[in-house]
Amino acid sequence: MLFNSYFFILIFLPLLNCGYFLLLKKERGKAALAFLILMSFWFYAAYAVVYAVFLAVQVLLVYGCSRLYDTAFFAEKKRRRFLQLSADLLLLGSLGVCKYLPEVGEKLAGRQDLFAKILLPAGLSYFTLRQLAFLIDRYQEKENHPPFLPYLAFVIYFPTLIQGPLTLSNEMLPQFGALYRNESGRVKPDIAGGFVLFTFGFAKKMLLADHFALAVNFGFSSAPYLDLLTTLAVLISYAFQLYFDFSGYTDMALGISMMLGIQIPINFSRPFQAENIRDFWKRWHMTLMRFFTRYVYIPLGGSRRGGLRTALNILAVFLVSAIWHGSSLCYLLWGGINGIFVVLSHGMEKRRRNQKKEAAGEAQETVEGARKRAGIAGMVGRIQTFLLFLLTLIFFRAENLTQVGQLFSSLFRITFPGFFLRMVQTLDFPENYLFKQIAVRLLPQSGQNLVYLATFFLLMIVAFCLVLAKKDAYETVSSLPEAKWRSLPFALWVGVLFVYSLCSLTGVSTFLYFKF
């Protein structure tokens, strides 16, 4: 079941809200929690019942391991350590076998059917890391053993199950624990705010990400024939597709959670406004980077053991992140290159701080001059960061190294209009029909192409305006005054946006991070 489907929006979500609110109104928090768990199982089993069985078995095993930590037998340090290593190997082993063995094994064996029957449950990477973090926190005695229902809800809570955000136990168990203890007064549902945020995310996915996907799919399938202009347009389109697809999903998950009175962490914080690549990765897929920072980077020593060790630790984080995304060489190169960029950014930032300290004792710069210089430097930094991100996307999206080479070589091929017109012609939307008819009558030779070009540049303008806005969707909804909610123009605008997005569901498309 997908968020962007008629069944989910018109049947599942209303049924969930009605049952959940009815139980909350009767102050039956534990029953509301059980109902939420059942609905989450239904949501997940809609992909395949065997997925739900796999998840249930993994949950029971991890919960059992957590319970063993409190027994007298595992109070001894070596036994406790053995239990932790065994549980970690169990989780990581299941992830490795299901996600990586088929691809790696097929390449080594040269047969595509050898590992075809291995199960790959949807969202495996997310709920495995979620439970791995919980077990590590239990081992380090940062978490107590929770009741079963709150723990089950923490793992299977459907808005975060398939594509994140990658929640941690310390931010979710207290909320589900309050429901379990029938403290329903602590749950503050916000139906209006949640619906608006869900609509914003829905529109991002349907009206922006899926439209940019048309140009992206054409560009990467035509990699040998592209030129500089078309390649840049394709890469920018892919950057926006990736962002609006994933942040759209996150906004929808945040909106659903807001309706239910459950708080989940944000996953994006205006990443395209980052002034360096290091800051970019602090703003993009924030919960995944938080996981790798807390459970990989810091245990390796973080930045406490000198410059070289810090650089190696950063590279390790990005290589692990690359492996999390997939086992192909393109992903490894993507992770390694991003790691090198972040190491260089870290070194330059450290050097810049030292230069500022040295200049502190010299002549003081005027406030206006300093502000102007910082503004110019910030703008240049944003452009550089965006361009670096675009280059790394070649590795992230390419199917193999041959396609990587084709795309890089196209950056040195200058023709006009080349494949650019063919690319924009993929943006053939039903909404353009009237405009195309008028344009053809006025300009028989070039009318349609002008409409396609106008569509592409309109999408680009809207995308740039959104990513460069001072507030993202969540901040916008959170800061809106109550009077705004009650205004008829605002309600009509949100309603039109929702209906327009719903009408765009001509074909259900999966979210990009579904495959991870």
Which residues are covered by each model-predicted region?
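Membrane-embedded transmembrane alpha-helical bundles that form the catalytic cores
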Residues: 1-467, 471-515
